Regions:
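Glycine-rich phosphate/oxyanion-binding loops and their immediately adjacent helices
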Residues: 37
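Conserved acid/base catalytic micro-environments in cytosolic active-site loops
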Residues: 1-8, 14-25, 29, 40-55, ...
Length: 353
């Protein structure tokens, strides 16, 4: 029998610590082994209690979560989930750049009334974080800041033969890291990513993804050529599409939100269906809502294939579940095998449930 995931809860609010402990303790797969009020206590208890996962508040006395994080990373193999305020995306992604595995946004008001809703997401994020290899977390911490560069050796800027469109929302950043760590150059493909994020997070996500693979990662700009071995991440506030046939370009549009979000996956997937036809692959990862389901249907109808994250490995099985229910999932797979399924698809091995 697998032992429970050991969790250390860190927050300067006694009420929040109590509520989180109670909420997490309902799941027998998780054991809260301790709590801490300050960053200093968090460091000490991480060493003493050896938790698998630390939930770490950002704003705390003595040492903030940001200041305590590098000490926790250096002194343990614990995966760290940041508890972030909605008004500090730059600080949250600074924490991710320092090695935190994931984050959850605390509501500015009414945290007590929201705990039931948040606890289910937090439990799933804890389980997902636990699956992240400690050495990959360390690689993120040790890597120097990078400026993503799309310059390629001679011959590498030819248009791709296949397009891979990837959609993610809640739980998406670590899921994307897992997927791209299993992909690399030489597959004659370009990758187009829609990740639902608050404003200000996209550039940091691109920097993190660039550390997982030898692909080039860029924040997409209107009119960019679509080149093989490059991943284009949609910027906040604009829908991303790919247009053209022989020569493919990125198109960014300030059109109305779809499913309440912009960028949304459906416009991207539908454009990939039109531009790539049978050479298109759609991937729907963890996330709330139904974004990606309609676009996946378009890709399948155009002769392409879709790969959908399974319920067990998803933080929220909203987007993947909606895709399955519409009958647009060519294959359903756990997160850790999705990169393998993408490679198989790129090599022409078609997979169907």
């Amino acid at each position: 029998m697998r032992s429970a995931i050991k969790v250390l809860v860190v927050d300067d609010s006694a009420l929040t610590r109590q509520m989180l402990t109670r909420a997490l303790s309902v799941d027998p797969a998780v054991e809260v082994v301790g709590t801490a009020r300050t960053g200093v206590e968090a460091i000490e208890k991480t060493v003493a209690l050896v938790p698998d996962v630390v939930t770490l508040d950002i704003e705390m006395p003595e040492l903030t979560g940001i200041e305590a994080l590098p000490h926790i990373i250096r002194s343990s193999t614990a995966r760290v989930i940041m508890l972030s305020g909605v008004d500090d995306p730059d600080t949250t992604y600074q924490a991710l750049d320092l090695g935190a595995t994931d984050f959850i946004v605390k509501p500015a008001e009414g945290f007590a009334s929201s705990i039931a809703e948040l606890s289910d997401i937090l439990l799933k994020k804890i389980k997902l974080a636990y699956r992240v290899r400690p050495e990959s977390r360390m690689a993120v911490r040790e890597a120097a800041p990078v400026v993503c560069d799309v310059q390629r050796p001679d011959g590498a800027t030819a248009p791709p033969s296949r397009l891979v469109a990837i959609a993610a929302s809640t739980g998406g950043p670590p899921a994307l890291e897992t997927v791209f760590s299993g992909l690399g150059s030489g597959l004659d493909a370009a990758y187009l990513v829609v990740q639902h994020l608050p404003k200000g997070f996209t550039s940091s996500l691109v920097r993190r993804l660039a550390r997982t693979s030898d692909l080039a990662f860029v924040v997409a700009e209107d009119g960019m050529l679509v080149e093989r071995d490059t991943a284009y991440v949609a910027p906040h506030g604009l829908h991303m599409k790919v247009t053209g046939r022989r020569t493919l370009r990125i198109t960014l549009e300030d059109t109305p939100s779809v499913h309440g979000v912009r960028p949304a996956a459906d416009p991207l997937f539908q454009s990939v269906a039109g531009a790539a036809g049978a050479q298109g692959i759609g991937v729907v990862l963890t996330g709330m809502g139904a974004d990606g389901a309609r676009g996946s249907r378009a890709i399948v109808d155009a002769g392409g294939m879709t790969i959908v994250q399974d319920e067990g490995s998803s933080v929220v099985w909203g987007m993947p579940g909606a895709t399955v229910r519409t009958g647009a999932a060519s294959h359903v797979a756990p997160l850790e095998t999705i990169a393998t399924e993408i490679r198989r698809g790129l090599r022409g091995v078609r997979v169907h449930e």
